């Protein structure tokens, strides 16, 4: 298969491929899709950057919309993580901080930490939170970051500056 099928450039920017990050954390479907859209926003089709971010937000909102699905997804993800950590499966777990620094050129210690990075770090944190409420709050925080990113992109498109 060609690279547009197996390794499209909009997912392989930098050292880490998006799918490798997602597999290493066993994200549920909606969260994996949200991260995918955050990472590819503006890269697959520059004219659809806002649309990709809106899709990411839609997946995050859908994930927390149904409490039963939300709780079950968190439970199954935690069970998968425990199982695979006990069995050496050879899948590298890339930290959210390393992944976002690679994708967006940011660091935890810099003042210019993009909303996309914050959203991905919060989504990842939600999968490791000690309880459902903290997971929910992390996802709510990620939604706010995506909203802020959408505003920044619209400002840039409209030529507005803050």
Annotated model-derived regions:
Residues 1-162:
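Intrinsically disordered, low-complexity regulatory regions
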């Amino acid at each position: 298969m060609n690279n547009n099928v197996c390794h499209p450039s909009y997912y392989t920017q930098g050292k880490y491929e998006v799918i490798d990050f997602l597999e290493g954390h066993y994200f549920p479907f909606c969260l994996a899709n949200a991260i995918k859209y955050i990472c590819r926003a503006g890269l697959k089709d520059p004219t659809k950057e806002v649309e990709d971010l809106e899709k990411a937000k839609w997946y995050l909102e859908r994930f927390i919309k149904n409490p039963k699905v939300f709780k079950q997804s968190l439970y199954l993800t935690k069970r998968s993580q425990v199982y695979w950590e006990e069995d050496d499966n050879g899948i590298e777990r890339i930290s959210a901080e390393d992944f976002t620094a690679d994708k967006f050129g940011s660091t935890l210690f810099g003042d210019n930490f993009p909303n996309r990075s914050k959203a991905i770090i919060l989504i990842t944190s939600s999968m490791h939170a000690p309880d459902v409420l903290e997971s929910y709050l992390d996802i709510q925080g990620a939604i706010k970051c995506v909203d802020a990113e959408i505003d920044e992109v619209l400002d840039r498109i409209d030529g507005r500056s803050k």
